[in-house]
């Protein structure tokens, strides 16, 4: 599945909660290590999740992302690709719920 197919839903979700696409991009680039140009290139090329995360340099503080997403505890996810996808889902949820950006980006933890 292309990341772009899900990205549209991420944008809709955060904008419904009065957050911006720019904030969404900041969250995703923090997690993946991509700059916004590279992220947009992956979206335009319809890169699938496997290739998207294969190219990413996951932020070292991503391990601090905890909790549940879709009823599944992140710490219990064994598949590395699925864990990265759920990290991104969790960050988007936190953004949509109005959590401060410095907490979403695990600054000062």
Predicted feature residues:
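A charge-rich, low-complexity, intrinsically flexible signal that marks solvent-exposed coils, linkers
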Residues: 1-109
